[in-house]
Design a protein with these regions (language model features):
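N-terminal export leaders
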Residues: 12-13, 264
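Terminal targeting segments of Actinobacterial cell-envelope proteins
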Residues: 1-9
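C-terminal region of N-terminal signal peptides and the immediate post-cleavage residues
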Residues: 24-49, 528
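Hydrophobic membrane-insertion alpha-helices, especially the h-region
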Residues: 15-27
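Intrinsically disordered, low-complexity regions enriched in serine, threonine, proline
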Residues: 6-7, 29-31, 59
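Compositionally biased, intrinsically disordered low-complexity segments enriched
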Residues: 4-5, 16, 50-51
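Extracytoplasmic/lumenal domain signature
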Residues: 47-83, 88, 95-136, 141-237, ...
Length: 530
C-alpha cells in the first residue's frame, strides 16, 4: 500500500548492504507443555478392566519446543498467559482467527462512539483529507483481564481505545497519538498490562493501562531513532509480536527492530519497561536497489515467526527470513531466506505447521517479475534456491492482487483480492476449488472460525459462509449490513464479532439472545440471513 513519502526530512542515499546492530542479552525461553490428549480405560460388564480390552494409551502431548515458536502451533490459539485474541491474526505464525461460537443470526449490540465518529485529518500522496473509522488492517484485540472482557484497537481519530467488550464503554481513556493510528494493536501476551501500537505520526508506542482511567506511554520508538536512515515512509502499520520479553516490530522507514523490553513492576506495583535495542534489520539489499530503484521499500507486513526464523516483506516485494535462534546469546540475526515477488507485498506472511509460507502480493507495477510469479503463492523455505511451490495470478487492469492476509483452513487456503474475489485454494496443489465475487474491494483478511468463513466488502456487507466442507462452493449463512467500507479484519471471540468500518463506527455484533442485546445503542446495522 503506497503512500507518498512525506517531505519531513531529506532522504539520504546509502549503501544497501545488510546492516545489523546487536547488543548482548541474556535470558531463557520457558515453554509450557500442551496436553490435548485424553484416555479412557475399557471395562468389562462388571466395571472391571480386562487386559484384552484395555486400549493402548496414546498421547498427543508435544514436548517443549526448544526455540522461539513451535511450527506445529500454526492454526492454534496462542499458548500464553493472557487469554484472548492478542495480535493481528492471533498468533506468531499469523494463523489463528479467534474463538467461537460464531453468532448464527448476528445483530448490532453496540457501537462506539455513541455520537459522531472516529475521524481525523491526514495526508496521502500530498493531499490532506478526512479519514474515518478504521481501515487496513484494523484487527481488534479481545482479551480477558480482571474478570472483564476488553476490546482494544487504534482508530482514524488518532486514538488508541480500550473498551468493555460487553457494553462498549471506555475502560481506559483514549490515548491520542499525533496522526492516524492505523494498523492493528498487540496486547501483551504474558499478563503485563501493556499495549503495543504504531501510528502515522512516526512513533510506535508501548502503553501502560494499569494507571486507572489514564493510559501512560512508557516508551516510544521513533522512525528516526537509532541512527537508521529512513528510506521511504515513517509510519508503523505492522502489528508487533512480543515473545520472551522481546519486541519484534516493522517500520515503513524500511527497517525492522528487535527490542528487549525488560518488563517488570515498580515498588507501587505499576508495570515498567526498560527497552534495549537488540537489532535493526534492513528490508532491502544491494540486489533490490537494482531491481526496484524507486526505493519504495517500506515494511507494512506484520512480523511472522515460525521455528527460529523471522519473516517479513516490503513494498518492493522482497521477502526475507532471518535466523534468530541465538539472538538471546548476543549473536546477530542472519539472513537465511530471500524471495522477490516483484511487487508491493503488504499482506502478512502466513506459516503452516510444516513451516511453509503463504503469501499475497499486489499487482501495481506490472513488471515482468510479478507477472511471472503471480499474486497468490506458496513458498517452501527449505528449498531456498527454488522455493515457489505454486502460484496464481490476479492481474486485471488497474490495481489488483492481494492486500488481505490469507487464511488457512482444513487443506485449503483462502485468499481475498482487491477486486472482491474470494478464493478457496488447495494448499498442496494450488488448484482453485471455488471462487466468489463480492463485487467490491476486499482488503479485510478472511476469518475462519468453527467452519464459518467471514469476509467483509467495501459496500459494508459482512458475509459468513459455511465451510464445513471447504472444498465445495460454500453457501451463504448470513450477511450483516453495516455503514461504510469494511477494510478491517474482524475479531471473533466467544459469540461476538468486533470490527470497525470507514463510516467512523466500531461495532460489536452478536445473536439477539446475547445479554448485551438489551443495551444496543442506536445504529443502522441490520442482519440478513443467507
Amino acid at each position: 500500500m503506497q503512500h507518498a513519502a512525506p517531505p519531513k526530512r531529506r532522504v539520504w542515499l546509502l549503501g544497501v548492504g545488510a546492516v545489523v546492530v546487536v547488543v548482548m542479552l541474556w535470558g531463557v525461553v520457558a515453554w509450557r507443555d500442551r496436553d490435548d490428549s485424553s484416555a479412557t480405560a475399557a471395562t468389562d460388564g462388571g466395571g472391571q478392566q480386562t487386559a484384552a480390552e484395555v486400549p493402548e494409551t496414546t498421547t498427543t502431548t508435544r514436548p517443549p519446543y526448544d526455540g522461539w515458536v513451535d511450527p506445529l502451533s500454526s492454526g492454534e490459539k496462542w499458548d500464553v498467559e493472557t487469554d484472548g485474541y492478542l495480535t493481528f491474526r492471533g498468533n506468531p505464525t499469523r494463523s489463528w482467527y479467534g474463538e467461537g461460537p460464531v453468532p448464527s443470526d448476528p445483530q448490532v449490540l453496540w457501537t462506539y462512539p455513541g455520537a459522531g465518529g472516529m475521524c481525523g485529518r491526514s495526508s496521502d500522496g500530498g493531499n490532506v483529507s478526512t479519514w474515518c473509522g478504521d481501515g487496513w488492517t484494523g484487527n481488534p484485540n479481545v482479551f480477558e483481564r480482571d474478570g472483564r472482557t476488553w476490546v482494544s484497537f487504534g482508530g482514524y481519530d488518532y486514538g488508541l481505545h480500550w473498551l468493555d467488550a460487553d457494553t462498549g464503554e471506555e475502560i481506559v481513556d483514549t490515548y491520542t497519538t499525533g496522526d492516524l493510528a492505523k494498523g492493528s494493536m498487540t496486547t501483551d501476551p504474558d499478563g503485563f498490562p501493556l499495549s503495543y501500537k504504531g501510528s502515522r505520526d512516526s512513533n510506535f508506542y508501548v502503553v501502560a493501562t494499569d494507571r486507572g482511567e489514564q493510559p501512560e506511554v512508557l516508551w516510544k520508538l521513533n522512525a528516526y531513532d537509532y541512527g537508521v536512515q529512513k528510506i521511504w515512509n515513517d509510519d508503523f502499520d505492522g502489528a508487533a509480536l512480543v515473545i520472551d520479553d522481546h519486541l519484534f516490530v516493522s517500520g515503513e522507514n524500511s527497517w525492522f527492530y528487535i527490542v528487549k523490553l525488560n518488563r517488570g513492576y515498580d515498588a507501587a506495583g505499576k508495570v515498567t519497561v526498560a527497552p534495549q535495542l537488540v537489532a535493526t534489520l534492513p528490508s532491502f539489499d544491494d540486489q533490490l536497489a537494482v531491481d526496484a530503484p524507486d526505493r519504495h521499500w517500506s515494511i507494512e507486513t506484520s512480523p511472522t515467526i515460525s521455528g527460529n526464523t523471522l519473516y517479513f516483506a516490503n513494498s518492493a516485494g522482497l521477502i526475507q527470513g532471518f535466523d534468530i535462534s541465538r539472538v538471546k546469546d548476543g549473536v546477530a540475526p542472519t539472513r537465511v531466506f530471500r524471495y522477490w515477488t516483484g511487487d508491493d507485498t503488504d499482506a502478512t506472511i502466513v506459516a503452516d505447521a510444516d513451516g511453509t509460507l503463504y503469501v499475497g502480493s499486489e499487482w501495481e507495477k506490472g513488471n515482468a517479475r510479478s507477472k511471472q510469479v503471480g499474486q497468490m503463492m506458496k513458498l517452501d523455505p527449505s528449498r531456498p534456491d527454488d522455493p515457489l511451490v505454486w502460484s496464481l495470478p490476479d492481474q486485471v487492469a488497474g490495481k489488483a492482487g492481494i492486500w488481505a492476509t490469507p487464511a488457512l483452513g482444513d487443506g485449503v487456503v483462502y485468499f481475498a483480492t482487491n477486486a472482491g474475489r474470494v478464493l478457496g485454494v488447495d494448499k498442496v496443489t494450488g488448484e482453485v476449488l471455488w471462487e466468489k465475487n463480492l463485487g467490491s474491494q476486499t482488503w479485510g483478511s478472511p476469518v475462519v472460525v468453527d467452519d464459518t468463513l467471514i469476509e467483509g466488502d467495501c459496500e459494508g456487507n459482512l458475509n459468513a459462509y459455511d465451510v464445513s466442507d471447504p472444498r465445495v462452493d460454500p453457501p451463504l449463512e448470513w450477511t450483516v449490513e453495516l455503514d461504510g467500507c469494511i477494510e478491517t479484519t474482524p475479531a471473533v471471540w466467544r459469540g461476538r464479532i468486533y470490527l470497525a468500518t470507514r463510516s467512523g463506527q466500531f461495532y460489536a455484533l452478536g445473536d439477539p439472545d446475547d445479554p448485551a442485546a438489551t443495551t444496543t445503542s442506536s445504529s443502522t446495522g441490520s442482519a440478513t440471513p443467507g
